[in-house]
């Protein structure tokens, strides 16, 4: 097993490069920016269809009334995401351009959205246009529009293919003319693509893409497809790479389209049988976080005999219950731990197999609503599938199955740690392995300094003016824990530090307001890209490492001392 993990680690640089790909990142960040639309629309789905579980059905008029906000939000999701994806990609492209010659992200957003409409929305006979492919069915077309638009803009801006106005013309007016040529070229190019496809195939670009990838969608929904997809989430995380950065953008179009398909099947009184959805990913495969670790902190608390493991279980049970499982991943650790390789990869796969069995064989309806990822797994299963009786049974069964899968491996690991505690010797081999893969080379030194410094944080304070700190993680979960710890300690010791949390990719507009940026381990691989942004603004940047980061989220004094050290 050790040799297998060493072999896997050799491919880590390649996978890290993929995870930093600006196009995959743009898709992911584009969806994050559009998440309010997705979650807002799901409220009306729950109101409209959850009562069905108790035999109550709204009248057609009320159902139409409730679903109108859904149609005007989720129903045109691709239109919004085309703009937000263009904006995210523009931010990435601007890192390579001089500060005095940047691409206007507002203009790329508008051009992308116009280009998308030309490729997805056919004119209606009575006026206006049809919206059949403006929702989840048009997501891939939205990505094409965004990518083409931003690249056209970059070529034009970089080579000064723009209209220059005299210096005495106001900057806002000059910007309009500067954007005119790239806007025109990108929209005309996309419209030309639409005319070519329409003339050749007789359908829009969006419809042709939907027809082309339909077999892929069907294959992905099979047992082999779900095994590869959800196994990859856990696999990448295990070797120290943020799996969602690679997998989520690749399947985003499928997951959100399937939610919409399932909803329409339910509305038609049919069986909602599409398995690959956002709910499957968040509440089935990653119930309690990647690796389906919901039950693991409880096992550490209840069956472990070693003091260390029991303490880790108690500290990580609450965040893991809400899908934030970094405390158990790095605290145990589970990642890069050969003992946990099998259950960490196998549990998510077994979970989705069981779910597919419930859907295909027992005729349970799959997910038809998008919910916040911090919703506890069992609750997310019940809510996302409209309170079906089978959903309660499924949630309980998955907890039992995951317990059975993890139990023997937790016992083996506990015996190992217990023996170390009895002998008074600690095996640092695994700790060193995690440090190497999560860039934790200086973790012990940093933490040691923090322990000394926190004895007299106020007395040794070197921060005399208000200092703003931004903590970034993958989704805004653990970054909130560290930001809260910092704010509490700063108030207690009267240190002028204010901390805020955010998700990497959604940080760029607020970045100029901060003096220090702290990267969580999940996004530490983006350090070089982030440094290009912070250096332009004169902002300090620091990345944290595995166990160090988790310790800082629990230790406000140590976290404050850590911040103070960055200004020494």
Curated annotation (Swiss-Prot):
UniProt GO cellular component terms: plasma membrane
Domain spans labelled PTS EIIC type-3: 7-409
InterPro entries in UniProt: LacE, PTS_EIIB-like_sf, PTS_EIIB_2/3, PTS_EIIB_3, PTS_EIIC, PTS_EIIC_3, PTS_IIB, PTS_Sugar-EIIC/EIIB
Reactions performed catalytically: lactose(out) + N(pros)-phospho-L-histidyl-[protein] = lactose 6-phosphate(in) + L-histidyl-[protein]
EC number: 2.7.1.207
Residue span(s) of domain PTS EIIB type-3: 466-568
Sorted UniProt keywords: Cell membrane, Kinase, Membrane, Phosphoprotein, Phosphotransferase system, Plasmid, Sugar transport, Transferase, Transmembrane, Transmembrane helix, Transport
Active site: 473 (phosphocysteine intermediate)
Subcellular location: Cell membrane
PROSITE patterns, sorted: PTS_EIIB_TYPE_3 (PS51100), PTS_EIIC_TYPE_3 (PS51105)
Membrane topology recorded in Swiss-Prot or TrEMBL: Multi-pass membrane protein
Expression induction or repression: By lactose. The operon consists of lacABCDFEGX. A second transcript of only lacF and lacE is also lactose-induced.
Swiss-Prot/TrEMBL GO biological process terms: carbohydrate derivative transport; phosphoenolpyruvate-dependent sugar phosphotransferase system
Pfam families linked: PTS_EIIC, PTS_IIB
Major localization listed first in the record, in broad terms: membrane
Phosphocysteine modification, residue list: 473
Keyword Transmembrane helix part of the UniProt annotation: yes
Keyword Transmembrane: yes
Ranges annotated as spanning the membrane: 30-50, 62-82, 103-123, 128-148, 183-203, 222-242, 283-303, 339-359, 389-409
A single GO molecular function term of this UniProt record: protein-N(PI)-phosphohistidine-lactose phosphotransferase system transporter activity
General function of this protein: The phosphoenolpyruvate-dependent sugar phosphotransferase system (sugar PTS), a major carbohydrate active transport system, catalyzes the phosphorylation of incoming sugar substrates concomitantly with their translocation across the cell membrane. The enzyme II LacEF PTS system is involved in lactose transport.
Note: This gene was sequenced from pMG820, a laboratory-derived deletion of the naturally occurring plasmid pLP712.
Entry domain remark: The EIIC type-3 domain forms the PTS system translocation channel and contains the specific substrate-binding site. The PTS EIIB type-3 domain is phosphorylated by phospho-EIIA on a cysteinyl residue. Then, it transfers the phosphoryl group to the sugar substrate concomitantly with the sugar uptake processed by the PTS EIIC type-3 domain.
Protein name: PTS system lactose-specific EIICB component
């Amino acid at each position: 097993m050790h040799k297998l993990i060493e072999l896997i680690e050799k491919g880590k640089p390649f996978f890290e490069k993929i995870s930093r790909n600006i196009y995959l990142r743009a898709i992911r960040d584009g969806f994050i920016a559009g998440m309010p639309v997705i979650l807002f629309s799901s409220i009306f789905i729950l109101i409209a269809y959850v009562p069905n579980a108790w035999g109550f059905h709204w009248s057609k008029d009320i159902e139409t009334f409730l679903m109108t906000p859904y149609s005007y939000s989720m129903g045109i999701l691709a239109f919004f995401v085309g703009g937000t994806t263009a904006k995210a990609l523009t931010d990435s492209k601007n890192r390579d351009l001089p500060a005095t010659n940047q691409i206007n992200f507002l203009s790329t957003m508008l051009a992308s959205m116009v280009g998308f409409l030309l490729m997805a929305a056919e004119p209606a006979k009575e006026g206006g246009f049809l919206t059949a492919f403006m929702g989840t069915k048009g997501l891939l077309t939205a990505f094409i529009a965004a990518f083409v638009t931003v690249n056209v803009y970059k070529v034009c801006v970089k080579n000064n293919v723009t209209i220059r106005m005299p210096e005495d013309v106001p900057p806002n007016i000059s910007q309009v003319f500067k954007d005119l040529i790239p806007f025109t070229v990108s929209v005309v190019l996309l419209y030309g693509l639409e005319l070519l496809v329409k003339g050749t195939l007789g359908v829009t670009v969006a419809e042709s893409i939907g027809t082309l990838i339909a077999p892929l969608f069907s294959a992905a929904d099979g047992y082999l497809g779900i095994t590869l997809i959800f196994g990859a989430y856990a696999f990448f995380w295990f070797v120290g790479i943020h799996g969602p950065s690679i997998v989520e953008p690749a399947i985003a179009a499928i997951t959100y389209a399937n939610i919409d398909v399932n909803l329409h099947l339910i509305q038609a009184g049919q069986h909602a049988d599409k398995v690959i959805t956002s709910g499957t990913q968040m509440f089935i495969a990653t119930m309690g976080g990647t690796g389906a670790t919901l039950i693991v902190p409880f096992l550490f608390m209840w069956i472990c005999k070693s003091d260390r493991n029991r303490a880790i279980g108690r500290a990580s049970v609450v965040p893991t219950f809400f899908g934030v499982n970094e405390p158990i991943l790095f605290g145990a650790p589970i990642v890069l731990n050969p003992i946990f390789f099998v259950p960490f990869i196998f549990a998510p796969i077994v979970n989705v197999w069981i779910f597919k069995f419930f859907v295909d064989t027992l005729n349970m309806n799959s997910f038809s609503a998008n919910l916040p990822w911090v919703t506890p797994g069992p609750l997310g299963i019940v809510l996302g599938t409209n309170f079906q009786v089978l959903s309660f049974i499924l949630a309980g069964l998955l907890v039992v199955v995951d317990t059975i899968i993890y139990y023997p491996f937790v016992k083996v690991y506990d015996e190992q740690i217990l023996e170390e505690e009895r002998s008074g010797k600690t095996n640092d081999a695994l700790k060193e392995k995690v440090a190497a893969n999560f860039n934790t080379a200086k973790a012990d030194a940093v933490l040691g300094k923090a322990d000394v410094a926190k004895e007299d944080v106020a007395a040794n304070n070197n921060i005399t003016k208000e200092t703003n700190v931004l903590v970034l993680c993958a989704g805004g979960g653990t970054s909130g824990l560290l930001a809260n710890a910092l704010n509490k300690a700063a108030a207690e010791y009267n240190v002028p530090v204010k901390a805020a949390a955010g998700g990497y990719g959604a940080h760029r507009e607020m970045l100029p307001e901060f003096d220090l940026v702290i990267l969580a381990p999940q996004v530490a691989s983006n350090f070089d890209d982030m440094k290009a942004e912070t250096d332009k603004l004169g902002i300090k940047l620091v990345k944290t490492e595995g166990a160090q980061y988790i310790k800082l989220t629990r230790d406000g004094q140590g976290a404050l001392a850590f911040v103070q050290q960055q200004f020494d």
